[in-house]
């Protein structure tokens, strides 16, 4: 079964699309769109955001679906699984790209943060992440694939984030007014 990771957004939408579609990592037939055309995804994502006035905040989600190196899997089948997995996110536009340049086959799924049907922004709660992983596992079972253990708990809060929350909470408790806290 595939290991699913929601990757922290660190690039612009154009930057991540350039990265995942890099021809040193994939080929044209392994680049597809779900509810959009892969070649015009950036414009389509932005049009949906403008239509629903949701141009601020996170613009996309980056999901990696990695398969075990010893799975009896070819690139086209991995891509097919990636497309089916992307369809799980109903109403969201996704670009699905299968990378061929590492020991393990993996899909990159770039998903618009705004639903094109109702304008709702996607929020990746721990529950939603777990449900997505379970759906991916179900797809892998259907294709007779093995299980890939996650190297890290996807729901673990990083230590730096816990420290930051504690520091902010302490600062809030030591301030009498909002202005004092901001200063």
Residue locations for each model-derived region?
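N-terminal nicking endonuclease/strand-transfer module with a His-rich metal-binding environment
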Residues: 1-183
